[in-house]
Amino acid sequence: MTMLLEEIVQSVELWLKLIKKPQPYVDPNLDPVLLVPGIAGSIMNAVDDENGTEERVWVRILGADYKFRTKLWSRFDPSTGKTVSLDPKARIVVPEGRYGLEAIDALDPDMVIGQECVYYFHDMIVEFTKWGFQEGKTLFGFGYDFRQSNRLQETLDRLAEKLEAVYNAAGGKKINIITHSMGGLLVKCFMCLHTDVFEKYVKNWIAIAAPFQGAPGYITSTFLNGMSFVDGWEQNFFISKWSMHQLLIECPSVYELMACLDFHWEHIPLLEMWRQRLDGDGNSQIILESYPLAESVEIFKEALSSNTVNYNGEDLPLPFNMEILKWANETRKIISRAKVPPQVKFYNIYGINLETPHSVCYGNEEIPVTDLRQLRYFQPNYVCVDGDGTVPAESAKADGLNAAARVGVPGEHRGILCEHHVFRILKCWLKADHDPFYNPLNDYVILPTAFEMEKHKDKGVEVTSLKEEWEIISQDQDHDHDDKVAADERPMVSSISVSDVGAEACATVTVHPQNEGKQHVELNALSVSVDA
């Protein structure tokens, strides 16, 4: 019955054109939010330093794999800690449009059909604007070159500048940072290395699906047979699996996502292989060999010892990079020392209830691994644990920080960014017109005991009445003529009715003549329902 009355009210509002062109809702009391993506989550453009032309190289449809190989393939420079594009003329930049949101919204803005497959923060941005956040005032984004180390000074300097800019744009309000995936490692590095800046500008940090202790299963398979860290995105991004592998093998960020050696795993992540060996009597036998984290590095080295990439007709060696591993190990030491400043609150949301790769096994008893350099052609088999399908929950919730709250949410690694459960939690923590009775730790809403609604019910018949009024203010500045014309007019009366099985609602709408630029509208509605 209430629904029938709502339909009547909406019909009248549409008729009066009160909601034909709604103005975006803006809440001036909200604190600013900065969204920080994870690996592969930023649009990247290549600038030709010779002629100044700029083109998108991640993500694109036409010529995607070719541009990816010619512009994004890179080599690590241990003297600077930076990975540099093989093309000496190409300079990789991240677009700053829409206050940084352009780079992290839809990763291919030109894709019209099926664009949702390359959405990143899109759904969250749409949801936030409904809550009253405004781009450039209280909503911002920070895209970055995800190939680089999470402690690259160039990236950290950009983040410091961004925080200051957001702080100033919001009128001196402190910032809520929301990170996804590897973005959590970037912010944790920044918090450790630039504690004073972090404390000055940040109010809350909310990490979502962050691989704080690594993503063992996916990173192992990334090194050995080219599976992308973000499972399933390759086919959407039109990049071959091996082209992605040849990029990631020189990316410090990927090495920084390896499983942490000093973390006390419930089950140690293993690299396992079925191998053909000779016993003491010289007889051949097939055995399962297991390598813990430290020992698996030797397997990576041997498996990638002959790996090359052909660039401009020249074969360049691309082995497992021990220099990057050293750099990544130092990054992990820095991250482990991070502490949340006393005035900042930290929250952690992590994905659960999905099979998530943890240990990886190659070969089987019928087809053992005979040559490690052929591992790229083997299909990995995973031993899975609970998580978001990419990051184990054990890793994501082990942030090592003083957290105000940690909440596990059923969801997939990327899809968790559009989960309404997550939106409810964020709305509460951001104080965006949140329900004071909502508890994000158990996702329950406790309703107040008092509930006021006028009803009359007798012998199975329920009657509900409704009265609503509007006042329309004309945009026309010349009201005198209209007032004279309307002086002798009578109010216009119309009726509306809506019916359903066992229920009926009717209403009378009275539109009074305009007076001094204002027009008064009254709605009186009555609904009657009969118990079935």
PLM features: what roles do these ranges have?
Residues 1-299, 311, 355, 377-383, ...:
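N-terminal non-catalytic accessory region
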Residues 305-312, 368:
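A broad, low-specificity signal for short, low-complexity segments enriched in glycine/proline
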Residues 12-18, 325-332:
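Short linear interaction motifs
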Residues 298, 304-305:
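Extended, loop-rich substrate-binding clefts of extracytoplasmic carbohydrate-active enzymes
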Residues 326-385:
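Conserved serine/cysteine hydrolase catalytic core
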Residues 309-330:
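Mobile cap/lid helix-loop segments that gate and shape the active-site cleft of serine hydrolases
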